[in-house]
């Protein structure tokens, strides 16, 4: 590990407020670009100026679907695919991202990406048609055990925040969406000042910025202010939730909330501390996981990590387990031991070096690089700053974070059990 940034990212902010980051990779054939808005499923109440606007659940995701429709009747997805690109998009609790990868015609595909995201076109007929498509997607998700176990964990952890609800919304909430709803949210959140453009490519960074400057609105618009309601308590709204679905083995997620640091260097340090703590305590190389794996209580689907959801951050672990309560008991025991004794220094250093190596190898995963750059900018920091910062984080710092976060009263458990099994369902998915 070194305290240096392994690669240089070109950075600029355009007069319209768009932040551009480009990592040049001249020896790679494939290029990647992401245009992202700081707007996600949890951002349902906002203002630009003095007037507050309330929107139903699911608007950000709905908008992501509809922006591919162009005013001339064409479809941006088809246009990008026809030009050799592989495009897609996603909406999370606090971000919407549109992206493509390609080996040729990068500039042409970048033109298409910038044009369709900045050119909204909605009609009553097209919005009504999309309601049926998304409603079907929502109903299919209701029977998806992976979505159900996550959704119910959010219901347990969150009392009020919009992250409690599915990003796609509900069949009832999306029925309230109109063309005017979509136009209002696009005007507010898709201003260049609330967006970032991140690319890994062979094209000169100045050229990438110039194309964005030509195609996006030139005005420097105000950034919307969002309201997520009263701050969440760090204790969960509900301690556990169990449902029955068509699964072959029970699935579980155990989680806890923690309060995000202010945007900037403190946010990045907290993110790295949380991720490093989770891997050192509960990761696949830890005694916790290996003991439970040998005992048949956890399987290969297991994972653990931390993530930020607007004004709330989460630490989560889980996977398939035939005895979720036994896993939870071991989590509490592990957290208590680390609170008492701290981390083993040698084991902690091995995990830190492995995490550094994973970050380094990740620089060749272009999609991850672009998404990480975008998330960093929305969090007030530069992705590459993780490299000099990670060696500074101490085992004592991580033990303190884990001790504060993984107290018994802050944990919530979501379980999906097979239909007809012994587990009683506490709620509907």
Q: What is each stretch, according to the model?
A:
Residues 102-107, 201-206, 320-325:
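Helix N-cap motif at beta-to-alpha junctions
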Residues 196-201, 349-429:
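C-terminal regions of mature proteins
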């Amino acid at each position: 590990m070194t305290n240096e940034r392994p690669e240089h990212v070109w950075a600029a902010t355009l007069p319209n407020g768009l932040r551009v980051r480009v990592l040049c990779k001249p020896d790679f054939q494939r290029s990647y670009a992401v245009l992202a808005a700081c707007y996600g499923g949890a951002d349902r109440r906002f203002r630009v100026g003095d007037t507050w606007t309330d929107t139903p659940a699911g608007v950000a995701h709905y908008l992501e679907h509809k922006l591919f429709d162009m005013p001339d009747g064409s479809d941006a997805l088809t246009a990008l695919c026809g030009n050799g690109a592989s495009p897609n998009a996603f909406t999370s609790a606090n971000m919407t991202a549109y992206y493509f990868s390609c080996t040729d015609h990068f500039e042409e595909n970048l033109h298409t990406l910038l044009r369709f995201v900045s050119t909204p076109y909605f009609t009553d007929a097209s919005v009504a048609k999309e309601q049926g498509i998304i409603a079907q997607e929502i109903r299919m998700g209701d029977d998806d055990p992976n979505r159900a176990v996550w959704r119910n964990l959010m219901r347990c952890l969150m009392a009020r925040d919009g992250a409690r609800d599915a990003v796609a919304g509900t069949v009832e909430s999306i029925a309230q969406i109109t063309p005017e709803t979509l136009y209002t949210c696009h005007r507010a959140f898709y201003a260049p000042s609330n967006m970032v453009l991140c690319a890994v490519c062979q094209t000169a960074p100045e050229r990438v910025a110039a194309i964005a400057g030509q195609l996006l609105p030139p005005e420097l618009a105000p950034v919307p202010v969002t309201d997520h309601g009263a701050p969440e308590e760090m204790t969960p709204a509900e301690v556990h939730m169990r449902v029955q679905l068509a699964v072959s083995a029970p699935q579980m997620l155990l989680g806890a909330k923690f309060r995000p640091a202010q945007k900037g260097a403190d946010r990045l340090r907290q993110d790295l501390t949380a991720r490093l703590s989770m891997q050192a305590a509960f990761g696949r190389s830890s005694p916790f996981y290996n003991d439970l794996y040998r005992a048949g209580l956890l399987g290969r689907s297991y994972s653990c990590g931390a993530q930020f959801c607007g004004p709330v951050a989460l630490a989560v672990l889980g996977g398939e387990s035939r005895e979720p309560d036994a896993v939870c008991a071991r989590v509490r025991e592990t957290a208590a031991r680390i609170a008492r004794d701290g981390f083993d220094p040698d084991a902690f250093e091995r995990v830190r070096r492995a995490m550094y190596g994973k970050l380094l190898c990740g620089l060749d995963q272009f999609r991850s690089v672009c998404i990480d750059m975008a998330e960093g900018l929305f969090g007030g920091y530069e992705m590459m700053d993780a490299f000099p910062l990670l060696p500074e984080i101490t085992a004592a710092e991580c033990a303190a974070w884990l001790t504060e976060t993984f107290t018994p009263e802050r944990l919530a458990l979501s379980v999906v059990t097979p239909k007809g099994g012994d587990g009683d369902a506490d709620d509907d998915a």
